[in-house]
């Protein structure tokens, strides 16, 4: 009987350990802590995929808005229509900025992402001031909008340089 009793106790110990381990893992997930099974290289790849996707989305929004400005310049839209169009594009920039803020960003890419978000914010503000210029005709607003757009490009290029430098470093290590 004692061997059956020992087997029964051993079985219950194993079940108890499995239950406790499962509860521990469940508590970690409930508390919002993540158990990372990915490697730093996987995290870098995920960030780069997200970053390049963000850049593509941004380019699409910027190109579409620039096309609308072209139509306005040709007289296809009046000023009020262009103001409305600009107002419809501003939330798209907000969405891009929010999207970037939700990235799981490795530390080595954080400064580059911050610069890119700064670029998006400057481009958004430029479009906002351009809208105000259309409404008021104030050349100062147009000049400030142009300066902000120039800054947005500068921040974007700096961001790309930082990402490319980190990416090149990863290629030489890996």
Model regions and ranges:
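Alpha-helical segments in soluble extracytoplasmic regions
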Residues: 46-174
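Intrinsic low-complexity/disordered segments
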Residues: 9, 38-41, 120
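N-terminal Lys/Arg-rich, disordered targeting/topogenic segments
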Residues: 1-10
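Hydrophobic membrane-insertion alpha-helices, especially the h-region
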Residues: 12-31
